């Protein structure tokens, strides 16, 4: 776990800030993304940068659309999705108006300083020549491989890359995507803060399934799309505790089912789903407390672990997001599943308070009454107390 923490804090990693889409007043920028093949990737980048994603158009939200969408350009209310990619690539918040889609703009390249004359149709991709890869595209490729490659042979075959090309993840051909990954990206996941090599399913269940169905293992379909049928939304709410908090022990037991560990940007603690680890005990403390913990801590049943897995999968399926994004949302909402569901759906917590960010957690550690009072004013006394308990678990 210490190794994962070091990777998450790699100063040389070309990743964007966790407050990239946070305003100066501390509030998160809200985005609405029109349905498209790139919506999932954009949502992941936005949430990682501290922003929120709305399921419907809301007042004050930045409306995003792909260049070339006639309705979006005709309205003049939409910003090009290239805005998100450029902000991530430069790791800075750029001018929104320079990316506004409209009849007078060149939709294919809405960057600052671009010519506004000519057709509104997107510029066709050139048939010859090379298009340079951006850091955002490299992250997108690694993320796609991590989520969709089911075996080491998947990345050397062609099906995965053809599926990636059809998803319009980038403007590159599947041959170029495959070449980029095999020659430049494979084994470099740690530099992009994506953890270890993606193609290593830890679940024996997934391994057996891949052996039984080799074609499915190379199909390029997202893993979360192959999950068993899930109950309706009403059942999801039934799985949530009355106080809205996740059972951390359940999620710790459930984590291996997904084969992923998620490292948060917040200081001093790491999570597996919503499991937080505090400071490691000294050998003396460990030897003294371990027997008591084994006696007092109730064993989690298989049924309870299954319920936790089901709830997380339902959030992933419901909002079409990956495990990392759902986990980050849970962390920013102190492990409250009901609040997390509301946050992913509307970009807001049901109690109206903001989500927690790295700076808030740093302030929470300060022994300063003024700082603590400011946090209580910002989040409410109950949420501050809940956050403190959440970090201790």
Curated annotation (Swiss-Prot):
CDD domains: rap1_myb-like. A motif (Nuclear localization signal) lies at residues 377-393. This is Telomeric repeat-binding factor 2-interacting protein 1. Residues 282-297 have a biased composition (Acidic residues). One of its GO terms (biological process) is positive regulation of non-canonical NF-kappaB signal transduction. Residues 125-185 form the Myb-like domain. Keywords: Acetylation, Activator, Chromosome, Cytoplasm, Isopeptide bond, Nucleus, Phosphoprotein, Telomere, Transcription, Transcription regulation, Ubl conjugation. One of its GO terms (cellular component) is nuclear body. Residues 223-252 have a biased composition (Basic and acidic residues).
């Amino acid at each position: 776990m210490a190794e994962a923490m070091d990777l998450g804090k790699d100063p040389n990693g070309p990743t964007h800030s966790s407050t990239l889409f946070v305003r100066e007043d501390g509030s998160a920028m809200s985005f609405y993304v029109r349905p498209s093949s790139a919506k999932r990737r954009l949502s992941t980048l936005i949430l990682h940068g501290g922003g929120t994603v709305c399921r419907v158009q809301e007042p004050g939200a930045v409306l995003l659309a792909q260049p070339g969408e006639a309705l979006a350009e005709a309205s003049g209310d939409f910003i090009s999705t290239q805005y998100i990619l450029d902000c991530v690539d430069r790791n800075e918040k750029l001018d929104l108006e320079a990316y506004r889609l409209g009849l007078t703009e060149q939709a294919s390249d809405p960057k600052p300083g671009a010519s506004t004359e000519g057709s509104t149709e997107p510029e066709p991709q050139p048939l010859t020549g090379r298009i340079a890869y951006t850091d955002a595209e490299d992250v997108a490729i690694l993320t796609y491989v991590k989520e969709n490659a089911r075996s080491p042979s998947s990345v050397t075959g062609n099906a995965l890359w053809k599926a990636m090309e059809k998803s319009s993840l980038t403007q590159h051909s599947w041959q170029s995507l495959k070449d980029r990954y095999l020659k430049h990206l494979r084994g470099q996941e740690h530099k992009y803060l994506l953890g270890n090599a993606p193609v290593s399913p830890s679940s024996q269940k997934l391994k057996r399934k891949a052996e039984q169905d080799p074609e499915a293992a190379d199909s390029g379909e997202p893993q979360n799309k192959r999950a068993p049928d899930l109950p309706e939304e009403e059942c999801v709410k039934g799985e949530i505790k009355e106080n809205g908090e996740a059972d951390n022990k359940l999620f710790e037991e459930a984590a291996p089912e997904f084969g992923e560990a998620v490292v948060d940007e917040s200081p001093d603690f790491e999570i597996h789903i919503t499991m937080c680890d505090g400071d490691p005990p000294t050998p003396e403390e460990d030897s003294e407390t371990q027997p008591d913990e084994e006696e007092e801590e109730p064993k989690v049943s298989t049924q309870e672990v299954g319920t936790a897995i089901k709830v997380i999968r339902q959030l992933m399926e419901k909002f079409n997001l990956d495990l990392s994004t759902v986990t980050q949302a849970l962390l920013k909402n102190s492990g409250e599943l009901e609040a997390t569901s509301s946050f992913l759906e509307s970009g807001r917590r049901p109690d109206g308070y903001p989500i927690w960010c790295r700076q808030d957690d740093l302030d929470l550690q300060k022994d300063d009454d003024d700082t603590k009072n400011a946090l209580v004013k910002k989040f409410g006394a109950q949420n501050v107390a809940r956050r403190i308990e959440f970090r201790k678990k």
